């Protein structure tokens, strides 16, 4: 009986010691994730280069990003090769999560945009004149108005 009490006491002592480890180990990945989310959120909202920012502001985009209203048949993320190349040509880095339009054309307030195309408010539209690309950058969906 005495041996059983010692075994139970020893088991309780070991089991409480095993669960009493500091919680700092799982806390480190959580803090790392929170820091990365904060950094990502801050870069998503960074402004485009002043030299390339559109001067043609649309009333429909005034509350979104002060951009121009465009209609684009395709959209691509900022990490796609065509977008990365265009950004590098003009000496800036674009966030990989940004929305960018390809094959875009300017539309004016209340103008029609075909159902299968994307209505975007874009802050950089100077690259829309490029012959093969017609790229609009730093965009937000106009539906978010």
UniProtKB/Swiss-Prot annotation:
<feature type="disulfide bond">
    <location>
        <begin position="61"/>
        <end position="121"/>
    </location>
</feature>
<keyword id="KW-0964">Secreted</keyword>
<keyword id="KW-0732">Signal</keyword>
<keyword id="KW-0325">Glycoprotein</keyword>
<keyword id="KW-1015">Disulfide bond</keyword>
<feature type="disulfide bond">
    <location>
        <begin position="122"/>
        <end position="139"/>
    </location>
</feature>
<feature type="disulfide bond">
    <location>
        <begin position="72"/>
        <end position="104"/>
    </location>
</feature>
<feature type="signal peptide">
    <location>
        <begin position="1"/>
        <end position="20"/>
    </location>
</feature>
<keyword id="KW-0134">Cell wall</keyword>
<comment type="function">
    <text>Aerial growth, conidiation, and dispersal of filamentous fungi in the environment rely upon a capability of their secreting small amphipathic proteins called hydrophobins (HPBs) with low sequence identity. Class I can self-assemble into an outermost layer of rodlet bundles on aerial cell surfaces, conferring cellular hydrophobicity that supports fungal growth, development and dispersal; whereas Class II form highly ordered films at water-air interfaces through intermolecular interactions but contribute nothing to the rodlet structure.</text>
</comment>
<protein>
    <recommendedName>
        <fullName>Hydrophobin-like protein 1</fullName>
    </recommendedName>
</protein>
<feature type="disulfide bond">
    <location>
        <begin position="71"/>
        <end position="113"/>
    </location>
</feature>
<feature type="glycosylation site" description="N-linked (GlcNAc...) asparagine">
    <location>
        <position position="36"/>
    </location>
</feature>
């Amino acid at each position: 009986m005495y041996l059983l009490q010692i075994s139970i006491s020893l088991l309780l002592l070991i089991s409480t010691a095993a669960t009493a480890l500091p919680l700092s180990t799982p806390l480190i990945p959580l803090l790392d994730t929170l820091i990365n989310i904060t950094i990502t959120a801050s870069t998503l909202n960074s402004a485009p280069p002043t030299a390339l920012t559109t001067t043609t502001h649309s009333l429909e985009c005034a509350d979104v990003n002060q951009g121009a209203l465009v209609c684009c048949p395709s959209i691509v993320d900022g990490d796609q090769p065509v977008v990365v190349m265009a950004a590098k040509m003009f000496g800036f880095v674009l966030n990989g999560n940004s929305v960018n339009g390809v094959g875009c054309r300017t539309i004016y307030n209340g103008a029609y945009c075909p159902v299968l195309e994307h209505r975007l408010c874009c802050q950089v539209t100077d690259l829309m004149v490029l012959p093969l690309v017609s790229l609009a950058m730093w965009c937000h969906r106009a539906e978010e108005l």
